[in-house]
Amino acid sequence: MFSSVAHLARANPFNTPHLQLVHDGLGDLRSSSPGPTGQPRRPRNLAAAAVEEQYSCDYGSGRFFILCGLGGIISCGTTHTALVPLDLVKCRMQVDPQKYKGIFNGFSVTLKEDGVRGLAKGWAPTFLGYSMQGLCKFGFYEVFKVLYSNMLGEENTYLWRTSLYLAASASAEFFADIALAPMEAAKVRIQTQPGYANTLRDAAPKMYKEEGLKAFYKGVAPLWMRQIPYTMMKFACFERTVEALYKFVVPKPRSECSKPEQLVVTFVAGYIAGVFCAIVSHPADSVVSVLNKEKGSSASLVLKRLGFKGVWKGLFARIIMIGTLTALQWFIYDSVKVYFRLPRPPPPEMPESLKKKLGLTQ
């Protein structure tokens, strides 16, 4: 499979060099015009700069997808685990709003009842579950991005790139949630049911004994409701925000930015995307939290009981969490790509063939 995907990726419109030499009819004029000292200007050797960028693998190769998956493991596993205390308080606000009246009150009550160690409840299923989710989310996103773009062709890929980002991310998240569901169910039980279990080792056998495999996968449909819109927004908003930042905000082209400068743009775009992600996915997140706490309940019953106001409980805490989380995930993921010297194509540009059709070239 990877060999066929790699073959397609070589002709992929996303697989463009970081530095391109585009003949605009002014190159000869610029190269021969005198400089400040009266000497002829030497043409900038951008091709030589591009050659110096040595990649560890080809774009769309099996190694590329595997290392992207590794980047997903590192970015999702570490960030979600680091934010376990905030996630714990957010979940408790959703399932027991009478007791946990707000984010600060939630922390105060939790510290009073469980101590500092209580804030780390559920760290093991969080780390395992979101590491597996990150592997599938980022790894499969790159796979589907290549496959769908080659199905569309170069011109349609550019014209419909937002739809492509949405489709590729939704496809990837479908599989990622199947990997996440068992650990998410265990995490919510540990965090929201006092006395049920303190560790994953205690919770998993108890859940299986009570409800069988259903205990681990009954929340997968609400997870899809929460995570697929979230991930679609996360990837599409990030990709288009990066494109807009380089076009309207960053004062120089991406090819002239240093790696640290590029990573700053990545972080900013990630945070902007994260705010929208939190808003889009929060109602389903509330349903998942309550559903995994209660035995024998269903998503429709929970949604009916919570009502419109109830599903938005804990939104402020989630905006802080998801905004920070998404920014850090994109920053770490892009840093992993830099570390392993993976191809990182710049924001897409209109193909020359499309420019000619639209009469944008002379």
UniProtKB/Swiss-Prot annotation:
The modification Phosphotyrosine is found at Y196. InterPro entries: Mitochondrial_sb/sol_carrier, Mt_carrier_dom_sf, SLC25A3/Pic2/Mir1-like. The modification N6-acetyllysine is found at K99, K209. Residues 87-121, 184-218, 285-314 are mitochondrial matrix. The modification N6-methyllysine is found at K112. PROSITE patterns: SOLCAR. Solcar repeats lie at residues 63-147, 160-244, 261-339. Residues 1-49 form a transit peptide. GO terms for cellular component: extracellular exosome; membrane; mitochondrial inner membrane; mitochondrion; plasma membrane. GO terms for biological process: mitochondrial phosphate ion transmembrane transport; phosphate ion transmembrane transport. It is found in: Mitochondrion inner membrane. It catalyses: phosphate(in) + H(+)(in) = phosphate(out) + H(+)(out). One of its GO terms (molecular function) is phosphate transmembrane transporter activity. Residues 50-63, 142-161, 239-261, 334-362 are mitochondrial intermembrane. Inorganic ion transporter that transports phosphate or copper ions across the mitochondrial inner membrane into the matrix compartment. Mediates proton-coupled symport of phosphate ions necessary for mitochondrial oxidative phosphorylation of ADP to ATP. Transports copper ions probably in the form of anionic copper(I) complexes to maintain mitochondrial matrix copper pool and to supply copper for cytochrome C oxidase complex assembly. May also play a role in regulation of the mitochondrial permeability transition pore (mPTP). Interacts with PPIF; the interaction is impaired by CsA. It is linked to Mitochondrial phosphate carrier deficiency: An autosomal recessive disorder of oxidative phosphorylation. Patients have lactic acidosis, hypertrophic cardiomyopathy and muscular hypotonia and die within the first year of life. This is Solute carrier family 25 member 3. It comes from Homo sapiens.
